[in-house]
Amino acid sequence: MTKPVALITGAGSGLSASLARMFAHEGYKVVLAARDAGKLTSLAMETGASVHACDVTNASDVEDLFAAIQGPLRVAVAHPSARVRGAIADLDPEDVRQALMITAYGSFLVGQEAARVMLEQEPENGVRGTILFTGASAGVKGYPQSAPFAMGKFAQRGLAQSMSRELHPKGIHVAWINIDGGIRNPGREEPADKPDSMLDPEAIAQTYLALVKQDRSAWSAEIAVRPWVETF
């Protein structure tokens, strides 16, 4: 039996690594993509994933990535993100452009190719596939010194909303996940005086899985996750 494929773009050592482990455990053939594919070697060995070098801001790279996928693409996670901080008067326009290319345009290219592939697939229990966008609270409200990140995440959220309304009736589940808080990562633990102040990547991954498993009679288009101590 051919395994379903779960693609994770913008893969690395944080949340995307937790997603890769989870989808592999769930029986998916995992495909990891990043600009620097070399950094994914150990994760690929651990999960049995295939690895592809891909610049998500390059349309040809993204097309080649999807063309190389073997098997039914049931999950695509658009995980690219770029953060540029600074006072609005001091920001370098080229740095801002590059950040928007990664977060907004990169999400568009990945979402577009995922939709193209899934629309051609036979549905399974009425569902052709699931496309998930990793968002942030910056896609809901802008913060000082963080305009480029907010611009990218607002654009990504708008993309996800448009795709949800267009593709849900065609059997493709699209959702945007607002990750409202910092994520525990190797080398980035929460302060001793602020226990439970960061999100556990394994717990976030379970939310992604729940979205994939949602019955189409009750699909979520947006969902927020945050630490229980977070003020919002």
Identify the role of each PLM range.
Residues 123-155, 160-161, 165-168, 183:
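Catalytic loop of short-chain dehydrogenase/reductase
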Residues 169-184, 190-232:
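C-terminal helical subdomain
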